[in-house]
């Protein structure tokens, strides 16, 4: 059976750290910023580490060969 391909969209959205955790940009920042608190906007500015179960799903289904 051939190797599973890495999903191109996942390559652009996720990064795997050296310890195997998955980093992604914070969600909820496309529009509607007026109603959001300043704390939310500040905290969502950078990247965040996904929860362990979500990270495992991303690696298994979308990034089988790592990055």
Curated annotation (Swiss-Prot):
What is an annotated GO biological process for this record, any one? translation
Pfam families in the cross-refs: Ribosomal_L35p
Against SUPFAM superfamilies, the record matches this protein to: L35p-like
Q: Where is the signal peptide?
A: none
Q: Which InterPro entries does UniProt cross-reference here?
A: Ribosomal_bL35, Ribosomal_bL35-like, Ribosomal_bL35_CS, Ribosomal_bL35_sf
Q: Which family does it belong to?
A: Belongs to the bacterial ribosomal protein bL35 family.
- PANTHER family linked: 54S RIBOSOMAL PROTEIN BL35M (PTHR33343), LARGE RIBOSOMAL SUBUNIT PROTEIN BL35M (PTHR33343:SF1)
Entry protein name: Large ribosomal subunit protein bL35
- Species classification: Bacteria, Pseudomonadati, Pseudomonadota, Alphaproteobacteria, Hyphomicrobiales
Q: Report which gene this protein is encoded by.
A: rpmI
């Amino acid at each position: 059976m051939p190797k599973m391909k890495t999903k191109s969209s996942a390559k652009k959205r996720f990064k795997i750290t050296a310890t195997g955790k998955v980093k992604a940009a914070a969600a909820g920042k496309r529009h509607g910023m007026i109603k959001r608190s300043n704390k939310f906007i500040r905290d969502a500015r950078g990247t965040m580490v996904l929860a362990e179960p979500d990270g495992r799903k991303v690696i298994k289904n979308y990034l089988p060969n790592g990055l």
